C-alpha cells in the first residue's frame, strides 16, 4: 500500500511539474505572438493559457481578454478575425474598416514577424534561463581550485579541502581543467593517489580519490538507472561484487555484460549502501563521427568529489554562454532529426508526451535549478519544432509568407486547405507515433 501511495505521489508530482513547465513555455511562446502582433497593429481578442472552460479572466484597456482555462495543456492567442497566430487562410468576417487590424489584413512583414515571434520567444527564454543560471552559479576559475568538497563513502580517503589549488595528481601536472579531466581518463583504477596542492600559500601532498570516481552526476529519464531508483550523488562501490574506483570501469562492465543484468552496490549520502540490479538498454549514442549503439544504464559521471571554485561572470559572458547553449540544443535537434530520417538511429529515440512529462518530473525532483534548466532545454526544442516548414506549425506559415513574398500572391485557398490538412495529419501522426514509442520502447 505504501508503494502504491508513493507511486501515485510520484505521478502527481510529474503531472504538476509538466503542467508548470508547459504553461511557462507556451505562455512565453504565445506572448511572443501577441506582443509583436500588437506592435504590428494587429488586435488580439483573446490570450489564453489552457483550453476549455474559463477559470479566470480580465479584459485590458486594449480590449484583449486575458484568461486561464481549465485544460492546462497549451494556450493560444486569437487575433481579430482569426483563430490564432499560427492559423492560415481566411478567418472570421470582420468590418472592412477593421481589416488592417486582423492577421490576414496586416502587411506581409507584420504577419511574418508576428508568427516568427513565437519560436523566437522560446529561444530568448532558453537563452535567458541559461545565462541567468550561469550568472548565479558562476563559472569555474581558470586555476584548478576546490570549491566545495562532496561527501565520500566510508573507506575512501579524501584529504582535499575547500580552497586547495591542485598542482599535480600522482606526479602528473594539473595546470588546468583539461589536464584534470585527462588525468581522470588515464590514471589506473585505485582507491587513492597523492595529490599535490597549494594550501595557505604552501605546497603540501595529501591523499585523495581517483579524479574520475564512479560518482553519479545525472540519471537519464526512462533509463535502467532511473527505473532502479539511482540518483545524482550516488557512488557505485562495486559491480557484481568487484570493487570499482573509476567511472570508466562502469562503462566497461556494462558493455561486457552485453545486455545481461548487473548488480551494483551503491552508497548514498545519509543512507548508506544498498544493492541495485539493472538491465542495460541498447541505445544510440552520439559520437564525433555520428552515432553508435551501446549498452547503457543511463548515468553520467561527475568530475570528482568536489565542485570547482567559481567566479561571477560578466553579463556579456553569461549571455554568450546562454546563446551558445541554446544554439547547441538547436544544432543537436537538427542532427538528431536528420539521423532519424536517414536511418542512422532508431525511431525509438523519438519520445512523446509521456517521456517529456517523465523527464520534467525527474528534473523537478532533482532540484529547482535542474527544473529551470530543463525548461530552457524544452523551450529551445519546442521553438525548433515550431519553425519546421510544416503547415499548421509556425514554420509552415512562414513558408507560405515566403511564397507570397517571392510570387507576389498568397497560396490559393484550395492549396492552403490541402496543405493544412496534410500538415495536421502529419503532426497528429507524429504525436501518436511518439506516444506509442513511450509505451512500446520502454
Task: Name each region found by the language model.
Residues 112-150, 178-221, 226, 275-309:
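PDZ/PDZ-like peptide-tail recognition elements
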Residues 17-21, 373-377, 424-430:
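Alpha-helical transmembrane segments of integral membrane proteins
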Residues 156-177, 227-247, 326, 419:
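Conserved PDZ fold ligand-binding element
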Residues 153-165, 184-188, 224-235, 252-258, ...:
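A short glycine-leucine-enriched loop at secondary-structure breakpoints
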Amino acid at each position: 500500500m505504501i508503494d502504491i501511495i508513493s507511486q501515485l505521489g510520484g505521478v502527481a508530482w510529474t503531472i504538476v511539474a509538466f503542467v508548470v513547465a508547459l504553461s511557462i513555455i507556451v505562455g512565453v511562446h504565445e506572448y511572443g505572438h501577441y506582443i509583436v502582433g500588437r506592435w504590428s497593429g494587429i488586435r488580439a481578442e483573446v490570450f489564453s493559457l489552457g483550453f476549455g472552460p474559463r477559470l479566470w479572466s480580465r479584459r485590458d484597456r486594449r480590449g484583449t481578454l486575458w484568461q486561464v482555462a481549465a485544460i492546462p495543456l497549451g494556450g493560444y492567442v486569437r487575433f481579430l478575425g482569426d483563430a490564432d497566430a499560427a492559423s492560415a487562410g481566411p478567418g472570421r468576417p470582420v468590418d472592412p474598416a477593421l481589416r488592417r487590424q486582423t492577421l490576414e489584413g496586416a502587411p506581409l512583414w507584420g504577419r511574418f514577424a508576428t508568427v516568427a515571434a513565437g519560436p523566437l520567444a522560446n529561444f530568448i527564454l532558453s537563452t535567458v534561463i541559461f545565462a541567468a543560471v550561469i550568472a548565479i552559479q558562476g563559472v569555474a576559475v581558470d586555476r584548478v581550485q576546490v570549491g566545495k568538497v562532496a561527501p565520500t563513502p566510508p573507506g575512501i580517503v579524501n584529504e582535499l579541502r575547500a580552497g586547495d589549488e591542485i598542482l599535480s595528481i600522482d606526479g602528473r601536472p594539473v595546470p588546468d581543467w583539461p589536464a584534470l579531466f585527462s588525468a581522470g581518463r588515464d590514471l589506473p583504477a585505485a582507491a587513492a593517489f597523492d595529490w599535490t596542492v597549494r594550501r595557505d600559500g604552501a605546497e603540501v601532498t595529501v591523499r585523495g580519490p581517483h579524479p574520475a570516481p564512479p560518482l553519479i552526476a545525472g540519471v537519464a529519464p526512462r533509463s535502467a538507472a532511473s527505473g532502479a531508483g539511482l540518483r545524482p550523488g550516488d557512488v557505485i562501490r562495486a559491480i557484481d561484487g568487484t570493487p570499482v574506483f573509476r567511472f570508466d570501469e562502469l562503462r566497461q562492465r556494462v558493455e561486457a555484460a552485453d545486455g545481461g543484468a548487473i548488480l551494483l552496490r551503491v552508497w548514498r549520502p545519509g543512507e548508506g549502501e544498498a544493492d541495485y540490479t539493472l538491465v542495460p538498454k541498447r541505445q544510440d549514442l552520439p559520437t564525433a563521427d555520428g552515432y553508435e549503439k551501446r549498452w547503457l544504464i543511463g548515468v553520467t559521471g561527475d568530475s570528482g568529489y568536489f565542485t570547482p571554485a567559481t567566479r561571477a561572470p560578466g553579463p556579456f559572458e553569461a549571455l554568450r554562454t546562454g546563446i551558445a547553449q541554446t544554439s547547441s540544443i538547436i544544432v543537436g535537434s537538427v542532427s538528431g532529426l536528420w539521423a532519424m530520417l536517414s536511418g542512422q538511429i532508431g525511431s525509438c529515440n523519438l519520445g512523446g508526451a509521456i517521456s517529456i512529462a517523465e523527464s520534467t518530473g525527474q528534473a523537478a525532483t532533482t532540484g529547482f535549478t535542474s527544473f529551470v534548466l530543463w525548461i530552457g532545454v524544452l523551450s529551445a526544442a519546442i521553438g525548433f519544432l515550431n519553425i519546421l516548414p510544416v503547415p499548421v506549425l509556425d514554420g509552415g506559415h512562414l513558408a507560405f509568407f515566403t511564397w507570397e513574398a517571392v510570387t507576389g500572391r498568397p497560396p490559393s485557398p484550395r492549396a492552403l486547405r490541402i496543405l493544412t490538412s496534410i500538415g495536421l495529419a502529419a503532426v497528429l501522426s507524429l504525436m501518436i507515433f511518439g506516444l506509442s514509442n513511450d509505451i512500446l520502447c520502454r
